[in-house]
Every structure is written in structure tokens, then in C-alpha cells.
Amino acid sequence: MKIRKPVVGKMVVTAVIVIVAVAVYAVWGSRRSERVHVREMALAENPGLKGILELYQEDSLKYEAALFLIDNMAYYQGADSGELESMYKAYDIFSTGRYTYRQALDSAERLCGKPKNVQQIRWKADVDMEPGFLVSNIEWAFKVWREQPWGKNVSFEQFCEYILPYRIGNEELVPWREKLYYQFMPIIEKYKNDPQIENPTFAAHIVLDSLLRAPFHFTGEMATSVRIGPRIADWRGGSCLDLCDMLVYIYRALGIPCGIEELPMRGNNNAPHYWNFLVDQHGQTWYFSMFYWWHRLLKAEVYDDVYGKVFRQRFSLNRAMTDSLQLPLDSVHPVFRYPFFEDVTRLYATDKAFTLSVGKRHLVRHVKRGEVVYICMSDRYAWKPVGWTRYDGSNAVFKDCHGGTIYCLAVYDAAHDKLDPVSSPFSVGKENGKMEFYEAREETEDVVLLSKFGMLGEFFLGRMVNGVFEGSNSPSFKQKDTLLLIREIPGRLCTMVKTDSSKAYRYVRYYGPAGGYGNISEAGFYSSANDTVPLAGKVLGPEDGAAGDHSYFNVFDGHTDTSYDYPFADGGWAGLDLGERKHIGKIVYTPRNRDNFVRKGDLYELWVCREGKWRPFARQTATSDSLLFKGVPKHALLLLRDLSRGEAERLFEYKDGKQVYW
């Protein structure tokens, strides 16, 4: 029986696993029969795998370990050798720390050609691997498990899932255990006489601590459909998923059980997120990551984020989930068709992992009794499934859902490969689990919009709080008056404030607060509140803030997408010599920002969600830093698109005259 040629596609949870074999059954059958069937297919495709089972006939644990890998390898494939040269070169260049990822990508393309996309890459099924590769992997995995002092506190089940696997995703298959073992084992050897070394969390801590003491480079721009593989341990740079992969390779090479947790969709952003985890001998889950550089290992229950669902990636197929679905494979949404993950939301949310029940009265279309319904999270104007249940005829009940985010229910239309919403979207309170449905009403209102994305990640804005605008008649500002003290985080692109100073000043400036790095994008000083043209003068600032792309000259260049970033946390300022004394009647300032505020001249489109489906409402070109849309349905979720630039946008509600982002 020959296993089908790999089908190239991206699995949502592991982000890159592609299914190799699966002419298994038209309907998921029993757990044992599926496993045996896949095993027989793999052994028939690669007779050399039978030799591995014969080799370990007398070693029951190695025999079971070999079976564990064989029973799951038919679901995996990796990039063939030589297919990823350009991508590897981009990571290599980026790892130097001298270039942005975009610059590294451009350089790699000039040197190696354009990177191949996932459809262009040649794939190699794992069932076709050389038996010797698998034997070497098993031997090295057992070596570290049995030799490391903490190995006795790692169960065989944990060993199989989080030490033994020869790959993480769909990376090119290359040997890695021996190299990484000798490269990083010196970290462990320094603590070989420490009694705590028998605790796997202690071993994980000291390795992480050592790794965090050396430079590494993060970027949110790296998002490939192919995992980088063990080379990431040397390159030490990339996305949060790349950095997670790095720790998995290093930890498993040393015999430390380690895996990856995933937010399939962040509760307040349109992206997944990843971090590492370890389960100790007492069953306690600890989380950590190179991305979380400010701490080491922390207990799962203190994780603080808006996450909806947390999935634990695993090497083995979650057969308990496939058994419970009992559906034709093509009728299952791709996220859950081959689940190489398990839901561990409750480990993180504890008593804030709520059971949500959506009754028939909240459904917007007929759902058949027994039909599979998916609970989904927002991804711009689409929905991404993160859980499923069967509708019992009265309610759709979903367990272990974290709050602080928006959900919507949907069914999967297999014929058209799309989700059909069956409820209006609803929010869930983070602390109490209270549900509120957003159903567009006939009653309308006018809305004033200032941005298209929430303040998530806009830490620059807070750096203006306690900053001051000052006037002086001394070039050194030895004697100065405060014209304006910023007391709260700016909420729009251009904030205008009238000043009531009766004095005139030759020198004016913005002086950033302690820890603010002088961050500001634009500052304008006006003689009167009615003036529309700011005063001009010679730009001033500290000598060490004059160079680079973020110098103080940006503060007066008229562009809100450039900014000042002083090289030191304190002492940053930017000002003007007006040439003569002038009254200051108004100040307009723009915080350093990520360009998600409304910008004059850009074309925007407002979308409204009705019964779970997003529809365009109206378009408008901004004539200032705000937009006024009239006749918008009340109590509807909204989304603002900038058709002129950028991709960051997030759904929000309009409440008490303000945008409230979810």
C-alpha cells in the first residue's frame, strides 16, 4: 500500500506541519485502528523501518519509542535539501544584528535568488527517511534521558513527546542532536555537583539564563511557512516562533523536555503568539521564552495576556480529539482535521477558563442538532476557529474559554471551504465571563474615529506622560517657564492645546520625562490659537541626539511618521531658536507612534459586522486626524481600514463617544 504524495498546506496550530499520509479513513475511526493502519502504511512504504523495530526487539522502551515515531511520521514532511538557501542566507545576515530583516531579505535575494514559496518547494516525506537517521535520533535521545541527573524525573510519556521527536515542524531534516549537545552541554557541566540539578526546571533555568546573556535579535516581520530548523540555534534571531524553536532544539539535545504553547489567535491582535513550556515532575507547567527576556521560568497560572485559547503543540496526533469528532475528514475544518495539539487553556486561566453557553435565541440561522459548531476569534474581517462542540438542539456549549476578547460561532461549509457565522459576535468578560452580544440595531449614531488599531504595542505614547513644553529667553534654558505639562497618554495623532502664558520667548522646546527617550514625532508652536502655520526657527537639541534616523530634527520636519528617539532614557529634548521673542498661544504635538492613527489625505473604509459577517459601510478621505461617519448602526462591531497604506487594523465598538478596541 503506497502512501499518498504529500499535500502541501499550512496547518494552523503548528503553523507549518503539512500532512503526508492520509488516506487513512474517510471518517476518523477508533484510536487504535487508525494508529495501526498508519503504522502499516509507513512500514510498507519504507521496509527499512521494520529493521529498526527488529533492532529494538529486546529493549522494550526503545521499541515503544520507535513505534511512537513511526505511528506519527506519516503525517510529516520536510523541505528537501537545497530548497531553502535564500531563506537561510536571510537569517544568517539578520543574525549579525547589523541589518533589519527587510535589508537581510533583499541581500539574500541578490546573493541567492528569490526565496521559494511553500508551493514551489520540493517536499520529502518522513516515511522515506533513512533508517539510520531515525536510529541515531533514538540513541541520542535515550542517551541524554538516561545520563542527565534530572532524567529520572522525566516520565516516558514526556520523553516521547518532548525529547524524542526528530523534528518540530516542516523544516529540512538534518542531524542536530550531537552537535547541539556538545555545543551547550558545558552550561550544564558547571552545575553537575549542585543538588538542584536533578530538577528539570533548574536545568532549564540555567540554560535559559546563559542563553539570555548573549545577544539575540527579534523581529515581528519574519513569518515564513517553513520552519528554519536547528540552524536557528546558531543564528539566534527571528520571530517569537523561531526563538521558541531554538530553545526546543537546544533543550531536547540536552535531555530537557520542552515544547511550544500557542495562542492560535491573540485575544487583542490579529496574530498568533508562541512561547516555550516545561512540565516538571509534579505536573506543574512552567512557561518561558527568549522573547520574555525579563524573566526566566514562571508558573503557567501567572501568565498575563488576552488569549482566548492556549494550544500545546505536540508531535503525536491528538487521537482523543479525532475520535470524538467522528466526522468525514473533509467535513472537519482544516484547523482540527489533523490536530497536533491539545487545549491547555485551563492550565493558564485556572478559574478564569469559562464555560460559554450560546442558546438558540442567539443563533442567526438554523443549526441542526448534533452539528459541529466552531467558536472563533477575530482575524480582521474574518474568523478563525479555536474550539468546537456539537449543538445539542438548544445550546452550543464550549469549555475553557478565556475572556477579554471577542468570539463568534460558525459552521464549516466544506463544499466551499469557508466558515459560515451562525451567531452575532460576542465579548466575554475577562474576570467574570459575562457574555455580551453585538447585534447591529436599526437605531444609528454618528461616530468620530481617531485610529484603526488599538494601542497594543504603542508603548511610545506613554513616553510623553510628564513631558513638558518650555519657553525661555536663555539658549541654555537655565531660566524657563512651563508652557504645557502632558498629564495623560495622547489619544490621537495631533493634540492641540491652548496656552495662557503672557510672556514672549525666543527659545521653545519639548523636554521628555525620565525614561521617555525624548520620544515625540512632531511639535508645533503657534503665536495664537487661530494660527494655522507653526512658528519656524533654528532646530536645537542635545549634541548626542543630532545623528541617525531618529534625530531631533525629525520633530520639526512636518512628517508625523518620523520621530525623535534620544539614545538615552533621560535628558532628551528638541526645540527651536525663533530668532526673536514671540508669544506662544497654541501647541500642537504628535507622539511617536506606529502610524495607526487617522492621517490626513488617506482613504478609509468603515466596515460593520452584521450577524457575524463583515460588510463595507462607507468610504471617506481624511481631511484631518479624525473621521466622521454618520448613520452607523448602534451596538455593532466596527473595523476601520486604511486603503492608502498599512495592514494593522482591529475590530472595536463605539461606546460613550470613544473607540473601544478588542
Residues covered by each model-derived region:
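Structural motif
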Residues: 343-346, 355-369, 455-461, 593
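Hydrophobic/aromatic-rich core segments of domains that either
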Residues: 30-43, 56, 190-207, 211, ...
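Short, acidic Ser/Thr/Gly-rich low-complexity loop/linker segments typical of extracellular
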Residues: 380-395, 618-622
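Secondary-structure boundary elements
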Residues: 35, 40, 58-235
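Short amphipathic beta-strand segments in non-cytosolic proteins
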Residues: 369-388, 469-480, 484-485, 594, ...
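Disordered, acidic Ser/Thr/Pro-rich linker "stalks" and the adjacent N-terminal cap
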Residues: 440-495, 499-504, 515-586, 590-600, ...
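Extracellular beta-sheet/turn segments enriched in Thr/Pro/Gly and aliphatic residues
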Residues: 335-347, 421-448, 659-662
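Short Pro-Gly-centered beta-turn/loop motif in secreted/extracellular proteins
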Residues: 394-408, 412-416, 502, 631-634
